[in-house]
Curated annotation (Swiss-Prot):
UniProt xrefs under HAMAP family: Aldedh_AstD (MF_01174)
Reactions catalysed: N-succinyl-L-glutamate 5-semialdehyde + NAD(+) + H2O = N-succinyl-L-glutamate + NADH + 2 H(+)
Catalytic residues (positions): 244, 278
SUPFAM superfamilies attached to this UniProt entry: ALDH-like
Family: Belongs to the aldehyde dehydrogenase family. AstD subfamily.
Keyword vocabulary terms for this entry: Arginine metabolism, NAD, Oxidoreductase
Documented EC number(s): 1.2.1.71
Signal peptide span: none
Known function: Catalyzes the NAD-dependent reduction of succinylglutamate semialdehyde into succinylglutamate.
Gene for this chain: astD
Record protein name field: N-succinylglutamate 5-semialdehyde dehydrogenase
Gene3D superfamilies xref list: Aldehyde Dehydrogenase, Chain A, domain 1, Aldehyde Dehydrogenase, Chain A, domain 2
Domain of life: Bacteria
Lineage: Bacteria, Pseudomonadati, Pseudomonadota, Betaproteobacteria, Burkholderiales
GO biological process: arginine catabolic process to glutamate; arginine catabolic process to succinate
Length: 487
């Protein structure tokens, strides 16, 4: 099967054969040969050849192609959503939302380019000062499996608008979504070599990351892999590296009047996308006392009735399967470790079928655990931490090396103002789920959640570098010479 897209054509890979499966049914979705090191070499060379013409193309012409891509996404929304659902297990309602987000990203990215990296002119005494922005060159984009369309799209779209060319290495767990997306780019009229697709597993990613002819690498994925990339590019300041990684995110619940609203936002924060969003709440901090007890009782009641089913089930479930049976078993193992450390089960996670990715939403009270591991468990595993007062809640919330998202559910704005000033995270929400983020704002975190290159609206910043010029249309001698010069 021809599954690599290099220099505007579909090609056979020379690497190992691998496959993706629907985690909710086990059925095969995609199979093909990955890219070998030689295939990666050809992809990078193709992007390098295409760079001069693409970057020289008028910005409006580049944007016209990108807008055509958005229009085709709308036309093919159902087909792409179905592929996302089949390959990731997420319900169709959520897959459709992902495709809609991909299309909406285009106008937002164009606006961000003009606002953050456009051209500025200001008069000076001797001419005009001009600020322009230039593309880096060839950039590698590494995509994750949880949003296999939307998240790499958040790097690719602004990179292309800025004039870069791209080599895209998707997750080996979602190659079918990547192929379908690249087909849409091809049909939108993107010139040959501007976007290249190299499918593959770890060896393909290593070959691309190690290539000496890339000018940048944009990564979304785990903190462990991102940290390895950061070490790898140490001593290479010429490479622009943008890392979007995970978090051990806290949601603090205060004593609120509308307990059902608090429970709803906690459910969304912890269990949306089966807990497979990097902004999901991993720790839910609940006050000690009667209110906290009532909240936990209601939270457990609603969580116990969350439906999980195949992507196209009717009626639609809230959750689908996690990405694989292996991921499901790792979550159950993580729960077992926490129980061994002294956590008290409120709802225990169980894997429905060892061959599939279905697990239920689970809740553990980890307050008794003396040394709680600072880890991101990428699934529907909510850890409850009881606190005494706001200072205690903030201290516990900040007790992490990560800093992606955090949230507060509270009626009192004074409490919110105290919280937002003290919390250490890049996305901090009040009376909204932790995984709610605006595309018109930056998306990124502090600590081990990234390397201070936020994406979304600020992706324009790492897709181009500033070029400052002082210009005069006429060459002439200055009115006054510097001391010691004689003409």
């Amino acid at each position: 099967m021809t599954e690599l897209f290099i220099d505007g054509a579909w090609r056979d890979g020379a690497g190992p054969v691998f496959a993706s499966r629907n985690p909710g049914t086990g059925e095969p979705v995609w199979e093909g040969a990955g890219a070998s090191a030689d295939d990666v070499e050809r992809a990078v060379a193709s992007a390098r050849r295409a760079f001069a013409a693409w970057s020289a193309l008028d910005l409006d012409a580049r944007c016209a192609i990108v807008k055509r891509f958005a229009a085709l996404l709308v036309e093919r929304k159902e087909a792409l959503a179905t592929m996302i659902g089949r390959e990731t297990g997420k319900p169709l309602w959520e897959a459709r939302t992902e495709v809609a987000s991909m299309a909406a990203k285009v106008d937002v990215s164009i606006a961000a380019y003009h606002e953050r990296t456009g051209e500025r002119r200001s008069p000076t005494a001797d001419g005009v000062a001009v600020l322009r922005h230039r593309p880096h060159g060839v950039v590698a984009v590494f995509g994750p499996y949880n949003f296999p369309g939307h998240l790499p799209n958040g790097h690719i779209v602004p990179a292309l608008i800025a004039g870069n060319t791209v080599v895209f290495k998707p997750s080996e767990l979602a190659p079918g979504v990547a192929r379908a997306t690249v087909e849409i780019w091809r049909d939108a009229g993107l010139p040959a070599g501007v976007l290249n697709l190299v499918q593959g597993e770890k060896d393909t990613g290593v070959a691309l990351a190690n290539h000496r002819q890339i000018d940048g690498l944009f990564f979304t994925g785990s903190s462990d892999t991102g940290t390895l990339l950061h070490r790898q590019f140490g001593g290479r300041p010429e490479i622009v590296l943008a890392l979007e990684m995970g978090g051990n995110n806290p949601l603090v619940v205060a004593d609120v009047e509308d307990i059902d609203a608090a429970v709803h936002h906690a459910i969304q924060s912890a269990f949306l996308s089966a807990g497979q969003r990097c902004t999901c709440a991993r720790r839910i901090l609940v006050p000690r006392g009667a209110f906290g007890d009532r909240f936990l009782e209601r939270f457990a009641d609603v969580a116990s009735r969350i439906t999980a089913d195949v992507y196209d089930a009717d009626p639609q479930p809230f959750m689908g399967a996690v990405i694989s049976a292996r991921a499901a078993s790792r979550l159950v193992a993580a729960q077992a470790k926490l129980l061994e450390l002294g956590a008290a089960p409120i709802i225990e996670m169980r894997q429905r079928d060892p061959a599939l990715g279905f697990v239920n939403a689970s809740i553990l009270d980890v307050t008794p655990v003396r040394e709680l591991p600072d880890e991101e468990h990428f699934g529907p595993l909510a850890q409850i931490v009881r606190y005494t007062d706001l200072d205690d809640a903030i201290a516990r919330a900040n007790d992490t090396a990560f800093g992606l998202s955090a949230g507060l559910l509270a009626d009192d704005e004074t409490v919110w103002n105290t919280f937002r000033r003290a919390i250490r995270a890049g996305i901090v929400n009040w009376n909204r789920p932790t995984n709610g983020a605006s595309s018109a704002a930056p998306f990124g975190g502090a600590g081990r959640s990234g390397n201070h290159r936020p994406s979304a609206y600020y992706a324009a910043d790492y897709c181009a570098y500033p070029m400052a010029s002082v210009e005069s249309a006429q060459l002439q001698m200055p009115a006054n010479l510097s001391p010691g010069l004689h003409f």
